[in-house]
Regions:
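Dinucleotide-binding Rossmann-like beta1-alpha1 core, especially the glycine-rich loop
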Residues: 29-105
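Conserved beta-strand segments of alpha/beta enzyme cores
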Residues: 9, 32, 57, 189-191
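Structured helix-beta-strand junction loops
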Residues: 6, 54-55, 121, 187
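Active-site/ligand-binding neighborhood in enzyme catalytic cores
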Residues: 72-74, 81-199
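Glycine-rich FAD pyrophosphate-binding loop
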Residues: 2-29
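Short His-Asn-centered micro-motif
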Residues: 13-15, 43-44, 175, 192-194
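Central helical "cap/lid" subdomain
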Residues: 20-21, 28-36, 193-199
């Protein structure tokens, strides 16, 4: 868009049969389906936020996911609501002490697999209820069979804020990402189903 506005000749080539890459949305019975997984736009940069709002109206979606472990609902990412539900702790200091106590009881100096790595970071309670099942489903393997380097850190927040992102602005385009990208590409030549590397 900016290159076209500056008077440049532009060509967008996409190997796929549609624009928008991994943020492509397709209307299915008046519902915008994110074909490559949900994407939530988020930024703390007001200039960026104002820019994308030139091409799309955004809803006020705030990502506040929860996890269901055997009928128990926990807030994600791990925060004080999670720790209160797990252990009945109320203050960040109590939660930090509980995590340190659990990590010390397990004490893994050199994690050999993902399970050991996760427990060394957040202790067995959080791992068992909120990491193990999800990770094994995602990778299709037991956590003990996965390398430790997959998890370098696990986000832990010692606040009662359930917002997944810390950014000031977030949302999803009301008409979908594809419509937003169409507006950005207005007047730009687009070639679909073209493999740039083969031609």
């Amino acid at each position: 868009h900016e290159a076209k506005e500056a008077g440049k000749t532009c060509l967008v080539i996409d190997k796929r049969n549609h624009i928008a890459g991994n943020i492509y949305t397709d209307k299915v019975k008046d519902i915008d389906v994110h074909q490559y997984g949900a994407h939530i736009f988020h930024t703390s940069n007001e200039t960026v936020w104002n820019y994308v709002n030139r091409f799309a109206k955004f809803n006020r979606y705030t990502n506040s996911p929860v996890a269901n472990y055997k009928g128990e609902i926990y807030n994600m990412p791990f925060n004080m609501n999670t720790f209160n539900k797990l252990w009945g702790v109320v203050t960040p200091q109590e939660a930090q002490a509980k995590i340190e106590e659990q990590k010390a009881a397990y004490h893994v100096e050199n994690p050999q697999n993902l399970e050991e790595q996760a427990i060394s970071l957040i202790g067995p309670d959080v791992y068992t209820k909120l990491v193990k099942g999800y990770t094994e489903k995602q990778w299709g393997k037991r956590a003990t069979e996965l390398p430790s380097f997959i998890i370098k850190r696990l986000p832990v927040r010692f606040t009662y804020d359930n917002n997944y992102f810390n950014d000031d602005y977030q949302g999803i385009p009301v008409e979908g990402y594809t419509k937003m990208i169409e507006r950005m590409l207005d007047g730009v030549e687009v070639k679909l189903e073209e493999d740039f590397l083969k031609n």
